[in-house]
Amino acid sequence: GVIALEESSVMLGEVVVKADLPATRLTGNVMVTTVAGSVLSKAGTANDVLAKIPLVTGGDGNFKVFGRGAPVIYINGRKVTDASSLEQLSSEDIKSVEVISNPGPQYPADVNAVIRIKTLPPKGEGFSLSAYSNTMLATFARNSENLDLKYRVGGLEVFANGYFYGGKWRFHDISALTTYGPQVFDQQVEAYTTPVSRNLYGKLGFNYQAGQNHSFGAYYQAGKSRVSLKGTVDTRVTSDGAPYESLWQWNDGDETELPDHNANVYYNGSFGKLSVDFNGDFLQTETSKSSTKVETGGLAPDQVVLTDAVNRSRMWAEKLVLSYPLWKGSIEVGEEFTDSRVSYNSVYHGAGISGGDTEIKESGIAAFAEMSQSFGPVQLGVGLRYEHVRYRYFEGGMLDNDLSRTYDNWFPSLTASAQAGQVGLSFNFTSRTRRPSYRQLDGTVEYINRYSYQAGNPALKPTRMYTAQLMAQWRYFFAQAIYNHENNSVFYTTERYENDPLVKLVIFENVPLYRQFQFAVGAQPTVGCWSTQPTVGIFCSFYTTEFLGREKRLDKPFLYLNWSNTVTLPKGWTVDADFMAQTAGHGQNCYIKATSYLNIGVSKRFFNDSFSVKLEARDIFDTANERVTMYNGDILVSTANYQGSRNLRLTLRYRLNASRSKYRGTGAGSSEKDRL
């Protein structure tokens, strides 16, 4: 959409052009999209808004920034820890969305991209209610319900939220695993899985505004979920092209998350020119898993494999940030502390593996500083982050000194931006690290079927990343180029288990060098009632591996097109059409086949926008599927995952005296929550 503004020169260092200023503008190294007052404000929820932001794709809480992977998402500085938070936030409450493709020192060193959602200032007092219901129909039906209540009087706000999600869906996965050696073994695997999910979450909190300069508050959130899975796996094995063995497996599993606990306390205020932001967080989860796998056929006797597993995690975190005006800009300093522990316990009956008993304890402290200065149309910024991490790995209750480590790292950053006429330019460089997730570090071998096991790798090293980014904007056109250099990047791979050519172990490994380059250009014009946003890009990765004794270069680029369209009609009608297409190309040690989707939606608003109805058809041609071929030494793995992405959706939303939350807690330990 187009925001009508008067002609202005530089404002707060942002790229500001004339009255045809588009919804998205370049501010330093941040792409800022204005939602309030644009067609995006009528999109529905935060999920619907993010799907239309430049360089962002995805939906239902699972988003990717072009070439950067999954971002960390914040709402008013508070990290989003579950997808329901985006579904609960109405697009009419959103002021702007900021996309940072190369975050600076104020964010943990393992964060590749950040999306910051800012809401409009709260207004009004008294009681308010917001409710929605979303029904999705694919092979089966799924439903989500949300109720949001607030009460305000004076500087006090009390809020409560309830969220339910449940339903049934179906996965269809096809795999081919070929092992080359004296004999060529080929395994064709076809699996059908039907999960049934029920999730219930509740949240209660308060916020108090003490005058103009101080606010504090707290919230507590608890939830419980259960997923039941039933399915079949049909495996056919050939040796040098001749039939060798056939195996059929029936699965019945259950995964229950005991009531998890998530709490936050915060203080936000100012003392003269000094701004203070403090947050403390606690997170605790426990998940129990049980499964029964019945395997018949094949050369080995029939068998029944029983699995019982429990995963527990706990985290404490706090973060303090101080900012102060300095000369022609400002300086920001802060520290962050996290203390986490994760345990994995599993027992197998009837399988050739015994399970495991592992525990990981990790504590870390970080300090960071960033200074920015303005010199006319030019802005310069420098930053530095220091992280000290102590990692301890326990097996069977005993400390493994060989797998325990201590890290001390410095991460510098540099930012420069300028405006030359109607052209805005920005350059930034960062040095970061990405530590493996706790699941990637868990060495317990997990049983999938007679021929397939899965495990983490406790010997994994952190990935060191160096990233340079150049961005530009002219009127409603924008462009971005990023180069990324990684040492010790973590790849998925497959290897023989105990040298058995038929049994595969899916595991993670470090690779010495992995490089990426990406370039994208797009526009956001508006013609009458039609707002359109085409973006085209190219993504290249550079990696060389060994396959079948020969060097294999994996450097075929992806071509990318994302085209969002909104037509605003009289009497509250809106029509949306979004198209995405990506050609085949290489990424890491994989060849990823082409994928695409087309979504069309129609919405209508009633009663002064207090009630709305939206009907959507997602992935109309059922082409948003994942098809990947992975190269691993003498093993070739091809997979095709059909997730049932084609569906119909009906969303109803009602708002009574709707008001925005004053809660200003930003959260601590955001990166650690993701790893947990």
Predicted regions and their residues:
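N-terminal periplasmic accessory domains that precede
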Residues: 2-5, 18, 46-49, 83-84, ...
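Short, acidic, small-residue-rich periplasmic hinge/interaction motif at the N-terminus
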Residues: 2-39, 59-60, 68, 100-102
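Surface-exposed extracellular loop regions of Gram-negative outer-membrane beta-barrel proteins
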Residues: 118-131, 172-176, 188, 200-204, ...
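Face-selective signature of the C-terminal outer-membrane beta-barrel domain
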Residues: 201-225, 251-396, 419, 423-424, ...
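Outer-membrane beta-barrel signature, preferentially recognizing the C-terminal barrel domain
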Residues: 359-362, 402-405, 433-487, 504-518, ...
